[in-house]
A protein has these predicted regions:
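Membrane-interface coil-to-helix junctions
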Residues: 7-108
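N-terminal membrane topogenic signal
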Residues: 1-3
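Transmembrane-helix signature of polytopic, membrane-embedded enzymes
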Residues: 108-126
Length: 126
């Protein structure tokens, strides 16, 4: 029931993005998506992306902490490469971001229960 409430509230909050009437913008579309797409496409080809020649005049990719190449949630990205373009499907990044909100809600419930809050109070605070 707790998972259902977390998923339902997240779906309501992000309904515009989940149902395709809106999308994330600014840093997501201009920096995060190109970096994630490059890393995922290189991994799908079986190559380690040490250098990114497409950003600026070229820059280290694997050493850039903002590329988030070793972040566990991004390990699924190579499986969602569009074969026609060779790029990552943009919706996948949005779904991963939204999934983090579900994880945050569930973590808050377990934290509050661990601190002695009632089950109703823990659900209400999350």
């Amino acid at each position: 029931m707790i998972i259902g409430i977390a998923v339902l509230t997240t779906m309501i909050f992000f309904s515009d993005i989940l149902f395709g009437t809106s999308f994330f913008w600014d840093d997501i579309s201009q920096y995060v998506y190109p970096m994630a797409s490059f890393g995922a496409s290189m991994t799908a080809k079986g190559e380690i992306p040490f250098w990114n020649p497409y950003m600026f005049n070229g820059m280290p990719f694997l050493a850039d902490f903002q590329a988030q190449y070793f972040y566990p949630a991004h390990w699924v990205f190579p499986y969602f490469i569009d074969p026609t373009t060779g790029m990552l499907k943009a919706r996948i990044i949005e779904y991963v971001i939204i999934f983090h909100f579900v994880i945050a809600q569930l973590s808050m419930v377990f934290l509050m229960r661990g601190l002695g809050a009632s089950q109703w109070g823990a659900k209400r605070l999350s």
